[in-house]
Amino acid sequence: MKEEGFIHLCQPDSGKSCGACCGLYNYADSTRESLVDRLRNRTRIFRETVKKANDPKVFLNRIRSIESPERIYDTIHCCEYLGFLDDEEKRVGCLLHPLQNDGEDMRDLSFYGRELCAGHICPSYHFISRDEKLSLTRIVDDWYLYGLCITDIDLVKEYFRFISEGICEVPRYERFEGRLKDIALDFFSLKISWPFRSTDANRFGKYYFDGSQYMISHIDYDHLGYERSRFDKIFLSLTSSFRTPDELREGEEIIRKNIEEFISCYKTDAIL
């Protein structure tokens, strides 16, 4: 049973959605450009192919014959029925869903089946607070970045912890507009643009993978001659790999400046 005021993180509004639980970011090449091409092609073929009950299987075989199956983590299934739900390509989601097929629910044909797909709730629903959910859905308007961030619990929790400590309160989600929204968006956009991101193909956030096994990565601060950074959880979420002490210091400065800019702007706006 869903709690009162339930926030649907999978499809929060008409401008974005998340497909992470469908394996969207588990492809070896999960860049925006690659995923857009993959989803766009699937959506087109699905619309052209699926007209009756057995057609989804024809679609599935065709997609598997033309797409690269390479994955980061072997155990996570990448669902071929994930595509764009709208012509503007703002929202990703299940092409088998009844809302995409004139009321006919075809999700039993998927790998996990209708019941699991319809009822799955990811850990972010439980560990990210209501205020954080409302704020993040207001900050990020893009499906690609939104999916990367809403599923990264450490990144979300740590950022809101630092800014909340700085302003001595939990920021109200309504405040995330104008300059405050831009500053917060700059931070979460580091998920894509972080200059110290590891180039290892088997890294994803704080995890690294070896076939069907996964482990949590660590930053070797002893090798860098540093104590553990107060931004360590953020660094791991950003898939960081620092080669020198100077790179670590620069990384800390990027995070520190963003947090301090947000705090200063928030306090200034509160006075006006």
Regions found by a protein language model. Give the residues of each.
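Charged, glycine/proline-rich intrinsically disordered loops and linkers
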Residues: 34-69
